[in-house]
Amino acid sequence: MEFASFLVSLGTSAIIFVVLMFLFTWLSRRPGNVPVYYPNRILKGMDPWEGSSLTRNPFAWIREAFTSTEQDVVKLSGVDTAVYFVFQSTVLGIFALSALLLLPTLLPIAATDNNLETSRSATDTTSNGTFSQLDNLSMANITKSSSRLWAFLGAVYWVSVVTYFMLWKAYKHVAALRAQALMTSEEVLPEQFAILVRDIPSPPNGETQKEFVDSYFRDIYPETFYRSLVVTENSKINKIWEDLEGYKKKLARAEAAFAATSNRPTNKTGLLGLVGERVDSIDYYTKLINESVAKLEAEQRTVLAERQQTAAVVFFTDRVTAALAAQSLHCQMVDKWTVTEAPEPRQLIWENLKIKFFSRIVRQYVIYFLVAITILFYMIPIAFVSAITTLANLQKALPFLKPIVDIAFIRTILESYLPQIALIVFLAMLPKFLMFLSKSEGIPSQSHAIRATSGKYFYFSVLNVFIGVTLAGSLFENLKALEEKPNSFITLLATSLPKSATFFLTYVALKFFVGYGLELSRIIPLIIFHLKKKYLCKTEAEVKEAWYPGDLSYATRVPSDMLILTITFCYSVIAPLILVFGVIYFGLGWLILRNQALKVYVPSYESYGRMWPHIHTRILAALFLFQLVMFGYLGVKIFVWAILLVPLIFISLIFGYVCRQKFYGGFEHTALEVACRELKQRPDLEEVFRAYIPHSLSTHKGDDHQFKGAMSRYQDYAAISAA
């Protein structure tokens, strides 16, 4: 990439961000856009501008985000969101502290050497030999075996020590935050009074599954056992319930149309309403609702009597017993009576609960194999696209484009954006597929599935994006050498890293300027909302569904941040300027997403920080990769003292082990000292029980309105997000 292309990419991205920020300031003040920019506050019954004012200052939202406290985030968006901001601030601190030392020391050391002047090797530059302005500020300009390399080795130690310090501090903080939130919750949390039991053996003759479960736990916990809810096969009844809810929506639309026009609407009864007999919509859907209610009630009786599965949710009268039971071994055989903490009612993946113990293990390894195969096969198109999107390779692969590419303006635009956009498009195709694979493992809860998906996406990103793109840029020119000497892979990776630096600099800049600009302005959700409201929505419920914002999407957001983290780590010493981009990315991310968490996004679940051990492990994995990369690159530079990085690699492994042993237990289970704290309100155990009843098995009788608390918390929002 030429220097002009880099400046064009950086400048246009910055201009786009500024335009989107001012657009956000203008659009967010318009009353008609309030549901798009303040849905979190609306759903909580707050005034959209509570705690702020309708000032014309375009930077007022920045002050609000900075002055908000962690407890404000917990109150409005949950503990998981607060933990995500601990992640953002921790990484920001790592890069800021690293930059304070690395920028003023490494840049002058690199700039005053002359390796690139004496030997202009194409494999030892940050931009294929054309970007000399930045080459001179990187390790590429350091002469092999030079004593200056001591500074770069010391920088690896500095970055590592800063990371250890910040991660230890963050782990302690998150552990305390989780415990405090569980102890001081103002609401009764149904999951704290329940456990999830799987792999239930066949009941003795003459006993039902429910009687068997009740007798088993009543014998073990005679004073605190309350009751059980046996999991049932609900696929058929769920279909009936979904049809019923669909008919109710269509009836509401028909009634709204009748109220607006005084003409009774009609529709055809055939395929997609395009063929068949034309009928009165109100009468037709009323009839279908009555028929579906009758079917639902009949199917409920059948399901409860005949379709009980080998899993159950067991309830206790106090939290301590539930926490103790979740940590205890109930059967000598590991594949019988498997007990874990119960997830939130809205989190349960009901169809996975019946999957047997050994089946879950087999599924897990099969999924791991499928993910590995997917990574390998996905690397082919990513490597190919990354290779041909460098202009030199693009002209080789598609010679007829040469006259177009030679035009200066087009060349600059293509070099600025083509490779990065191609990469972003390829990555956008993955999340749903990886979520499907994660759920196929037999995972019981939504939050656990999201953590599993995030882990897969992280390794996919590192292997395909970081390593794949790094090698792909020199794929055509080094493929023959790799065939002749397969053992030269590590050397090829190490020598390819510097010349991919400018690609990743541009990629990070595109992500934080354009990505966060679109996030703040919410242009796309705004357009979709107004189009739906104008042309599709007929009822208030449909309008509410149109602006419902969803959550922060941790399954994709955390791995995307981890990719930037990995890139910044691995280039922090090779090309220290990337630290500036890393600081801007996580600084802007903290600021903009803080605003979104306080005003926009609504959490779809609450795991009280269980994402943190996953985040901590991936940060350490990125640090470990950074240390390996620097060991390899110092070796390429023929610096014999690179061997001094070997102890650092083992220190990282030991640090990870110590953190897991000290902190992880408090995230895997609820500590008894936390569970024993007295609640502010007395729990209604019947409400706790009913919170776990699936929608399709809930009664449709007139007394449903009395169940608030747990039922309203877990079912109302779930109904909106599922619609």
Swiss-Prot record:
Residues 27-90, 170-364, 438-456, 530-572, 636-637 are extracellular. It is a multi-pass membrane protein. The keyword Lipoprotein does not apply. It comes from the Eukaryota. Residues 1-5, 112-148, 386-416, 478-508, 594-614, 659-723 are cytoplasmic. Its main location: plastid. The chain crosses the membrane at residues 6-26, 91-111, 149-169, 365-385, 417-437, 457-477, 509-529, 573-593, 615-635, 638-658. GO terms for cellular component: chloroplast membrane; plasma membrane. GO terms for molecular function: calcium-activated cation channel activity. It is found in: Plastid, Chloroplast membrane. Keywords: Calcium, Chloroplast, Ion channel, Ion transport, Membrane, Plastid, Transmembrane, Transmembrane helix, Transport. Pfam families: PHM7_cyt (PF14703), RSN1_7TM (PF02714), RSN1_TM (PF13967). Belongs to the CSC1 (TC 1.A.17) family. Acts as an osmosensitive calcium-permeable cation channel. This is CSC1-like protein ERD4. It comes from Brassica juncea.
